[in-house]
Amino acid sequence: MEIMRMNADHVASVAAIEKECFGRDAWSEKSVSGELTNALALWLVAVEGGTVAGYVGSQTVCNETDMMNVAVTADFRRQGIGEKLVTALVEELKAIESHSLTLEVRASNTPAQALYEKLGFTEVGRRPRYYQNPKEDALILRKEF
């Protein structure tokens, strides 16, 4: 598996994973493509045998980064790809002198919360009813570096 910066060749696959994982809340292919020209954005993909297995997207403003999306397609889950993507993102962010990475996660998504805790994230807040379908709170997690 290789982790690299997303390019135009990856956009359709990333959009398909978005739809698979997030349904009607998914980013469109046009929105994903727009991130290629967003100077604040950094998106990485995990590629296995020519197939995009997963991705992570972020946006950095004033040395603080928000993780926008992370997802792994069903065929590649439970193989540590999400962990590798977030770890690679943190390393890339350190190189551009970002000081922190913040994300939101569903309060019910305990597997993701366990991964983020393992990677050194701590809970810093809660956004009531942040998610729709179903309505649910988001936990705000942050990692300083």
Identify the residue ranges that each predicted region occupies.
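Conserved catalytic-core motifs of GNAT/GCN5-like acyltransferases
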Residues: 104, 117, 122-138
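Short glycine/proline-centered loop/turn elements that form peptide/ligand docking sites
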Residues: 86, 109-112, 129-134
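Acetyl-CoA-dependent GNAT
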Residues: 2-75, 86-88, 92, 96, ...
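Conserved hydrophobic beta-strand within the GNAT/NAT acetyltransferase core sheet
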Residues: 67, 101-105
